């Protein structure tokens, strides 16, 4: 019983939490990216210390008390921030025929030609903050960061981050 044995078993469990044939997200799906990683206090903009994470979340509407209802979520590590990999992520996680809401990134325009209904809900120069225009991904990113800070103390290496994202997805869904 060593730390290495426990760590290895936890990673095996994290890998087992994802079904390769899981259903695609459907309905209204919000897609965005966020950054996960170590603390970068006092800096603005994209940090080189943090890892870009792609987020897709079903928006199930709002309840009577105006609280946002979220459906299932999908998370994946991105190679670089703002990459076209985000479009491929949307293709592989969202069912055709769904409404995909994104920020003003031009790369998403191709989705309208591939059987998706695409809606820009904000642009880079929008006066509305992201948590207002794309509340689903921002809520999930906030929960993910709090979970990472509280459970793992910001100590998840990039090479293992996808396993931790899979665990978070399993717990969230």
Write out the residue ranges for each language-model feature.
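Residue-level recognition of single "structural anchor" positions
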Residues: 1-173
